């Protein structure tokens, strides 16, 4: 794949997450009874960064959970018995019933990953509401899903790929478009 353009560098990612944190606080009246749930892998790290910013602003910690939605994906081919992944589902260190859950992911594309994340959450409990925060929304939805908080809208063609790199995983903070 050939890199076409850098969309967000480290500073732009930091600014986008700070803005999203402020929007979350404003919409959720100080983040009382709110839990962030990051979708594995990069969504978890983004959720942790958002929680840190919210705590800096509000002075109160925010609970962060993890969603591993491998089992729930409808677009993954069946694995052989020897290659079954270890599936955790939702690992949220608090009761989600009657709480506001904010699902955090790096890129919103077709909406299938978010739908799978909501399926995993409903298996754990019944939140009062579910919101969605993404670093990048690239369009091309196949399901009626939209983000409540968006770092950057990046219209792309289906022949392009948006790749998010984060220090915690990739030793670099960067969002770029690649040609397939």
Swiss-Prot record:
Recorded GO MF terms: RNA binding; uracil phosphoribosyltransferase activity
Family affiliation: Belongs to the purine/pyrimidine phosphoribosyltransferase family. PyrR subfamily.
Lipid biosynthesis is among the record's keywords: no
One GO term (biological process): DNA-templated transcription termination
Signal peptide as annotated in the record: none
Function as written in the Swiss-Prot or TrEMBL entry: Regulates transcriptional attenuation of the pyrimidine nucleotide (pyr) operon by binding in a uridine-dependent manner to specific sites on pyr mRNA. This disrupts an antiterminator hairpin in the RNA and favors formation of a downstream transcription terminator, leading to a reduced expression of downstream genes. Also displays a weak uracil phosphoribosyltransferase activity which is not physiologically significant.
Keyword Transcription regulation: yes
Pfam families named in the record: Pribosyltran (PF00156)
Subunit and interaction comment: Homodimer and homohexamer; in equilibrium.
Residue window of motif PRPP-binding: 101-113
NCBIfam families registered for this protein in UniProt: PRK05205.1-3, PRK05205.1-4, PRK05205.1-5
Entry protein name: Bifunctional protein PyrR
Enzyme Commission numbers on file: 2.4.2.9
This protein's encoding gene: pyrR
Organism: Bacillus pumilus (strain SAFR-032)
